[in-house]
């Protein structure tokens, strides 16, 4: 982009009544301490004047030595590319009619991962955060596995197939780090648009969930995205308790699970269907 080695570029959505939602650039030459807005902002506008056009995610596409940007555009994702990080060209779109519908697409991300740990067999996972109307209420994170050829994303599944990254109520705005070596590590926002505006707050709303390492695996001739807490979270463990095997009929109570713990618990369960 011409700002020198070690510079940091930040892409963000600027929103106003006059200009709508547009994508802008800011750069830092002091290791992120301060940022300067690019004098020729915006770097990207919706060609059709779309109102909901936000959440840019930029990644390096090595096979063509170029940068790719994904932007959420109402009920689809739009792909753009650039060789100088300033001038962006439209490539394609994906998502209309796919997955849970009709939902607002937001906060995209896309990563390439080995399937079942095989580095010679890789697939792309397109992460799409959607709101509202999800299966368990409000907002959630779905994903699509498939192929990306540098121009368009081709989904493995039929449009009516929906895959959820997490089945909890508080999992949204999932984004991946780009400096975690061989691992792909993601962090979601631990909240839901059903009630996030009434959560007590000062400088922020809710919190982030635990970081998790992503992976692709096969099951029943299909490909799914796994999300396991990163290994570093084991350092948070303190007191532990083993519970012997038991059969669950209706209710089963375990008294005083951890005597010195008044906060969160981690449960590791092996469940066998009766």
Predicted regions and their residues:
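Acidic, glycine-rich loop-and-beta core segments that form the ion-binding/anion-interacting portion
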Residues: 113-117, 124-125, 131-132, 136-152
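Detector for glycine-centered tight turns/loop "hinges" at secondary-structure junctions
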Residues: 32, 65, 221-222
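A short, structural micro-pattern
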Residues: 4, 19-20, 52, 104, ...
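Beta-propeller blade signature
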Residues: 22-31, 80-84, 138-151, 201-216
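Hydrophobic core segments of beta-strands in well-ordered, beta-rich domains
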Residues: 1-18, 22-26, 39-48, 52-80, ...
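Beta-rich accessory regions
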Residues: 119, 147-169, 173-274
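A generic secondary-structure signal for well-formed alpha-helical elements
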Residues: 16, 27-35, 77, 86, ...
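Surface loop/turn signatures of beta-propeller and other carbohydrate-active proteins
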Residues: 1-3, 32-60, 71, 89-112, ...
């Amino acid at each position: 982009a011409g700002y020198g080695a070690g510079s940091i570029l930040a892409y963000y959505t600027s929103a106003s009544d006059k200009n709508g939602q547009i994508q802008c650039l800011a750069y830092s030459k002091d290791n992120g301490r301060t940022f300067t807005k690019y004098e020729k902002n915006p770097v990207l506008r919706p060609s059709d004047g779309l109102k909901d056009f936000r959440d840019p995610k930029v990644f390096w596409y090595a096979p063509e030595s170029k940068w790719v940007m994904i932007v959420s555009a109402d009920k689809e994702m739009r792909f753009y590319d650039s060789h100088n990080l300033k001038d962006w060209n439209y490539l394609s779109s994906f998502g209309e009619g796919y997955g849970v519908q009709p939902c607002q697409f937001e906060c995209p991300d896309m990563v390439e991962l080995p399937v079942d740990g095989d580095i010679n067999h890789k697939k792309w996972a397109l992460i799409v955060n959607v709101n509202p109307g999800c299966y368990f209420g409000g907002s959630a994170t779905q994903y699509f596995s498939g192929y990306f050829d540098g121009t368009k994303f081709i989904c493995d599944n039929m449009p009516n197939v929906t895959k959820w990254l997490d089945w909890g109520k508080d999992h949204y705005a999932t984004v991946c780090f780009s400096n975690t070596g061989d691992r792909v590590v993601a962090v979601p926002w631990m909240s839901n648009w059903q009630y996030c505006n009434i959560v007590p707050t000062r400088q922020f709303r809710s919190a982030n969930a635990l970081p998790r390492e992503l992976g692709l695996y096969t099951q029943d001739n299909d490909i799914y995205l796994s999300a396991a807490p990163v290994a570093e979270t084991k350092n948070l463990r303190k007191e532990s308790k083993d519970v012997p095997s038991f059969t669950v009929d209706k209710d089963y109570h375990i008294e005083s699970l951890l005597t010195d713990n008044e906060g969160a618990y981690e449960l590791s369960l092996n469940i066998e269907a009766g």
